[in-house]
Amino acid sequence: MGYPLHQLSLGNRLDTIHTDIRQLAARLGQVSRGESLIREMQQRLHTGEDKNPQPPGALFLQPRGYTSGTDTLQDEALRLAGWHNLAAQHGVKGYTPVPLEEILRWQPGTLFTSSFSESGDSLAERQLRHPALKRLLAKRPMVEIPFKYWICPGPMLADAVALLRQAREGVDQ
């Protein structure tokens, strides 16, 4: 069809997101807008930055027991927000299902989830309401971070980090 094509890397790290923004901005002839977007993102990411040497443990948990280990946007966001990703600590790489027994053994201080749609009653979603998980959650929150922040890497990572930091404030008090 003759249209120029530019493929983004869809990385899962902040530096890769910055590279994608710069490359796309250059392709569009909007270098200064790209740099401005990166500066704004950096400013938001460093606002409220936590220097706690002992970040609390947290875990992303999705239907069917999927969690986010290393090399994921969620792992990067947790780190930037001052959390310790228990899945990464236990060797989980990428998006991987983890047995409920492991999650219970890890004892996450906070659980995060993201809904793809309105809550349903699928077997996959029922796992998030398992009685053993409910007992764990009786003392810990499960915090919903909207899925729109994870659909693809970009400036919205700063919004996700802000929500994770907000949840962190409740834990630190």
Where are the language model's segments positioned?
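Ligand-binding "clamshell"
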Residues: 1-6, 122-140
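A ligand-binding cleft/hinge motif common to bilobed small-molecule-binding domains
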Residues: 110-127
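Short acidic active-site motifs
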Residues: 97-102
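Hydrophobic residues within well-ordered alpha-helices
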Residues: 78, 103-104
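Short secondary-structure boundary/capping segments
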Residues: 50-51, 75, 133-135
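Extracytoplasmic substrate-binding proteins
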Residues: 1-66, 87-89, 94, 106, ...
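Short, well-ordered secondary-structure micro-motifs
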Residues: 69-72, 123-125
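His/Asp/Glu-enriched short active-site or ligand-binding loop at hydrolase and phosphoryl-transfer sites
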Residues: 73-95, 115, 142-144
